[in-house]
């Protein structure tokens, strides 16, 4: 008995047309997108925690308490009083103790040691979480097509970050050179790379939150001009973060505690006192804080322009993303002024650094939604 036919089906003696074959996107190995996204979200949270702990390590002047770089054996802290005394004796050999911390007893040293040890230990945890996740998904063949390289990159950069951290600490482990902290250039490099890793993780998390088909379709409605503006906004925010790291490295946030002027002047006193001239832009605390303020004003002004343009987007979620990014930036500007007026106490300073993470990620999300808009339903 022949099968039933639809009343709209064309009648013929020929064989029925073969079912449509899936396209390249449909045939691609989907992998475990949800599980990988969750794993990257854990890494993202750990990197944010690392930035906060790193900031607290700097604010408590703890970064030079461990004078040796032992990536493996350093995971074990001192276990006996003799071990603690040996570590303290090593610390007593560097300039920070001789010039700044001779008042310290062993109990005081333990306090700063634990901060630095915790910071390094968290780095080891991040490396372990990345390795277990990546190789687990790789062996299970659950990585989506085209994603292997993208998932390797955070791990490679994490390894580089560990080396940069050692390089940074080495700049402050001096004897007779007068260094009592790490070099501000190296601190800025260390923090900048942390934000690069954070940005890569955030972008991947956003991509994995949608299917390849959805992303491919969304690219057809990319808001190219707005994407370019958001890219500039993101880069300017990143530059401001690097300058903020220079301010932190020089402890420049406590030098001038008035606003909007600096010591009653528009430009701080002696802005070009160092020689050669270029050093002032990186090593003069007054000029570096002045530059941080000026770039902050530029970032806000540019943000107003981008926000007004973003509000005209045809996509509701894109508009919301720009509203969120601008709101966070406005709050960050206010918090920056408060940080100056209160001479950068550690509680406000660390909140200022954490909010910088929020501003950076929210601007990045707005940029992502320009590249991959989410269509708004006609029904609203």
UniProtKB/Swiss-Prot annotation:
Recorded superkingdom: Bacteria
Subcellular location, principal: membrane
InterPro entries per the UniProt record, alphabetical: COX15/CtaA_fam, HemA_synt_rhodobact, HemeA_Synthase_type2
GO biological process, one term: heme A biosynthetic process
Cofactor dependence: heme b
GO molecular function, one term: oxidoreductase activity, acting on NAD(P)H, heme protein as acceptor
Recorded catalytic activity of this chain's protein: Fe(II)-heme o + 2 A + H2O = Fe(II)-heme a + 2 AH2
Keywords: Cell membrane, Heme biosynthesis, Iron, Membrane, Metal-binding, Oxidoreductase, Transmembrane, Transmembrane helix
Record Pfam families: COX15-CtaA
Entry GO terms, CC: plasma membrane
Membrane-traversing stretches: 36-56, 125-145, 151-171, 187-207, 227-247, 287-307, 320-340, 344-364
Enzyme Commission (EC) number: 1.17.99.9
Enzyme class: oxidoreductase
Binding site for heme: 292, 352
Pathway(s): Porphyrin-containing compound metabolism; heme A biosynthesis; heme A from heme O: step 1/1
Compartments where located: Cell membrane
Mode of membrane association: Multi-pass membrane protein
Protein role: Catalyzes the conversion of heme O to heme A by two successive hydroxylations of the methyl group at C8. The first hydroxylation forms heme I, the second hydroxylation results in an unstable dihydroxymethyl group, which spontaneously dehydrates, resulting in the formyl group of heme A.
Family affiliation: Belongs to the COX15/CtaA family. Type 2 subfamily.
Subunit structure, as described in the record: Interacts with CtaB.
Protein name per its UniProtKB record: Heme A synthase
Native organism: Ruegeria pomeroyi (strain ATCC 700808 / DSM 15171 / DSS-3) (Silicibacter pomeroyi)
């Amino acid at each position: 008995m022949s099968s039933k036919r639809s009343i709209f089906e064309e009648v013929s003696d020929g064989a029925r047309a073969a079912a449509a074959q899936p396209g390249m996107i449909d045939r691609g190995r989907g992998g475990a997108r949800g599980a990988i996204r969750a794993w990257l979200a854990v890494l993202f949270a750990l990197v944010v925690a690392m930035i906060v702990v790193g900031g607290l390590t700097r604010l408590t002047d703890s970064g030079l308490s461990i004078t040796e770089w032992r990536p493996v054996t350093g995971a074990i802290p001192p276990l006996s009083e003799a071990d603690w005394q040996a570590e303290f004796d090593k610390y007593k050999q560097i300039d920070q103790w001789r010039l700044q911390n001779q008042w310290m007893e062993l109990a005081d040293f333990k306090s700063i040691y634990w901060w630095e040890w915790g910071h390094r230990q968290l780095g080891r945890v991040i490396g372990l979480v990345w390795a277990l996740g990546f190789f687990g998904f790789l062996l299970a063949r659950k990585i989506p097509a085209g994603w292997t390289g993208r998932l390797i990159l955070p791990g490679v950069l994490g390894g580089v970050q560990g080396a940069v951290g050692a390089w940074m600490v080495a700049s402050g482990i001096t004897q007779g050179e007068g260094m009592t902290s790490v070099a501000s250039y190296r601190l800025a490099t260390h923090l900048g790379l942390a934000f690069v890793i954070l940005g890569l993780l955030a972008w991947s998390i956003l991509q994995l939150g949608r299917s390849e088909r959805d992303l491919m379709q969304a690219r057809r409605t990319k808001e190219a001009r707005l994407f370019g503006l958001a890219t500039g906004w993101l880069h300017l925010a990143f530059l401001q973060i690097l300058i903020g790291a220079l301010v932190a490295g020089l402890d420049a946030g406590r030098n001038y505690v008035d606003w909007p002027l600096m010591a009653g002047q528009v430009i701080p006193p002696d802005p070009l006192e160092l020689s050669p001239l270029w050093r002032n832009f990186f090593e003069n605390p007054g000029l570096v804080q002045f530059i941080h303020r000026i770039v902050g004003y530029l970032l806000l002004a540019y943000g107003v322009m981008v926000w007004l343009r973003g509000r005209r987007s045809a996509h509701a979620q894109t508009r919301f993303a720009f509203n969120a990014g601008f709101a966070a930036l406005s709050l960050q500007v206010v918090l920056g002024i408060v940080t100056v007026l209160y001479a950068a106490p550690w509680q406000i300073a660390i909140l200022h650094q954490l909010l910088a993470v929020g501003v950076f990620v929210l601007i990045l999300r707005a940029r992502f939604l320009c590249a991959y808009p989410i269509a708004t339903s006609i029904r609203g």
